[in-house]
């Protein structure tokens, strides 16, 4: 792992999405400014994603916006990349100035970070969402409400910026229009460009095994791999009832071949005659694995159902993605802290 990737690992942005029966597509752009960066880390980075796929990159070393997906390079002319390169060079300078201003306000020195996330989502029913927010040192700083054309500020420093930004009603309306119209238009265009990759479906391969995790404690693991898209719902049932509170979940991780893998586990009560089954839902297919009490042979039943759960973690780095399931009742966005 290179120095850049190692440094960016704490800069994960967690995106928690509600339990959903439909597939969601998203377009997200992340910008990261670093003051006094360590060796090998650019002072400014910008990356774009469609769903979990990196599509564009820019950093202060190359100072060029470049495609990260072949279907982006094939469908967008050279003048597109040059035009947005010039815009991002402007953003690079703006981030440098704003980060220095924030450090003065907070009386901070040394290495600090300033982040921006903007994007939109397109749901299967045609409805859309949009989001724009900033973070300082990995903590929420300013969050845009496009419905009220206002900013949510988290502290006194943010309130000072909020007042200045809200004085420019033209800019607020521009951001709202970009989130609701232009962002969605770009997302639809990119989905068409990369439809062979972005809109394909590969079903999960699922298996269950037992493992003695502690002396006298047996844990059942349900593992799914080889699936795409990464939206998947896994649960354990005991005697036909879901046991969410007793389960543990693994990360949803890229397998390196364009598919994903994950797992869910539950501790087995050796003194009971409970019947356990693992249920996996992915793109309308429901996989049920019944765990025999004595035998290691596990029958597999598949049937068509509707329903899936969407959960995402996006790393604001250069092409490195990690995914993790979050509690299904939560929704919103959380920035994990970055090192000082």
Swiss-Prot record:
Binding positions for 5-(2-oxopropylideneamino)-6-(D-ribitylamino)uracil per the UniProt entry: 31, 46, 65, 116, 174-175
Region (Alpha-3): 202-293
Binding site for 5-(2-oxoethylideneamino)-6-(D-ribitylamino)uracil: 31, 46, 65, 116, 174-175
Example of a GO biological process term: innate immune response
Region of interest called Alpha-1, as start-end residue ranges on this chain: 23-109
Entry's free-text remark on domains: The alpha-1 domain is a structural part of antigen-binding cleft.
Membrane topology: Single-pass type I membrane protein
Assembly notes: Heterotrimer that consists of MR1, B2M and metabolite antigen. Major classes of metabolite ligands presented by MR1 include riboflavin-related antigens, pyrimidines and ribityl lumazines, nucleobase adducts and folate derivatives. Forms reversible covalent Schiff base complexes with microbial pyrimidine-based metabolite, which serves as a molecular switch triggering complete folding, stable association with B2M and translocation of the ternary complex from endoplasmic reticulum to the plasma membrane. Alternatively, forms non-Schiff base complexes with ribityl lumazines.
Localisation: Cell membrane; Endoplasmic reticulum membrane; Golgi apparatus membrane; Early endosome membrane
Keywords: Cell membrane, Disulfide bond, Endoplasmic reticulum, Endosome, Glycoprotein, Golgi apparatus, Immunity, Immunoglobulin domain, Innate immunity, Membrane, MHC I, Signal, Transmembrane, Transmembrane helix
Location of region: Connecting peptide: 294-302
InterPro entries per record: Ig-like_dom, Ig-like_dom_sf, Ig-like_fold, Ig/MHC_CS, Ig_C1-set, MHC_class-I_related, MHC_I-like_Ag-recog, MHC_I-like_Ag-recog_sf
Designated name of the protein: Major histocompatibility complex class I-related protein 1
Residues annotated for 2-amino-4-oxopteridine-6-carbaldehyde binding in this entry: 65
Signal peptide: 1-22
Occurrences of domain Ig-like C1-type (ranges): 203-282
UniProt binding sites for 7-hydroxy-6-methyl-8-(1-D-ribityl)lumazine: 31, 46, 65, 116, 174-175
Ranges for region Antigen-binding cleft: 23-201
Cytoplasmic side: 324-340
Parts of the chain on the Extracellular side: 23-302
UniProt-annotated stretches for the region Alpha-2: 110-201
Gene Ontology, cellular component aspect: endoplasmic reticulum; external side of plasma membrane; extracellular space; MHC class I protein complex
Organism: Pongo abelii
TM regions (residue ranges): 303-323
Residues involved in pyridoxal binding: 65
Predominant location: membrane
């Amino acid at each position: 792992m290179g120095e850049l990737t190692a440094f960016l690992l704490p800069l994960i942005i967690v995106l928690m999405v509600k339990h959903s029966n439909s597939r969601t597509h998203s377009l997200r752009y992340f910008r990261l400014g670093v003051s006094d960066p360590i060796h090998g880390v650019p002072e400014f980075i910008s990356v774009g994603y469609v769903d979990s796929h990196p599509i564009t990159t820019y950093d202060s070393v190359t100072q060029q916006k470049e495609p990260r997906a072949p279907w982006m390079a094939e469908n967008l002319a050279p003048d597109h990349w040059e035009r947005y390169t010039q815009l991002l060079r402007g953003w690079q300078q703006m981030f440098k100035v704003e980060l220095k201003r924030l450090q003065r306000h907070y009386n901070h020195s040394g290495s600090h970070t300033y982040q921006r996330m903007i994007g939109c989502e397109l749901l299967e029913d045609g409805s859309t969402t949009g989001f724009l927010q900033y973070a300082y040192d990995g903590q929420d700083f300013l969050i845009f409400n496009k419905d009220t054309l206002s900013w949510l500020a988290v502290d006194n420093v943010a309130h000072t910026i909020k007042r200045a930004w809200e004085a420019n009603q033209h800019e607020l309306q521009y951001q709202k229009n970009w989130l609701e119209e232009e962002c969605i238009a770009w997302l639809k265009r990119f989905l068409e460009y990369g439809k062979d990759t972005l809109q394909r479906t590969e079903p999960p391969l699922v298996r269950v095994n037992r493992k003695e995790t502690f002396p006298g404690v047996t844990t059942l693991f349900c593992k799914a791999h080889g699936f795409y898209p990464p939206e998947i719902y896994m649960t354990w049932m005991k005697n036909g009832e879901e046991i969410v509170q007793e389960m543990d979940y693994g990360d949803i991780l890229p397998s390196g071949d364009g598919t994903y893998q994950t797992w869910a586990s539950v501790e087995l009560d050796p003194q009971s005659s409970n019947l356990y089954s693992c249920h996996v839902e992915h793109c309308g297919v429901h996989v049920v694995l019944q765990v025999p009490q004595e035998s290691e042979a596990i029958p597999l039943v598949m049937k068509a159902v509707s329903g899936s759960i969407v959960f995402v973690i996006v790393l604001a780095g250069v092409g490195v993605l990690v995914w993790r399931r979050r509690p299904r009742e939560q929704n919103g966005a959380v920035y994990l802290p970055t090192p000082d």
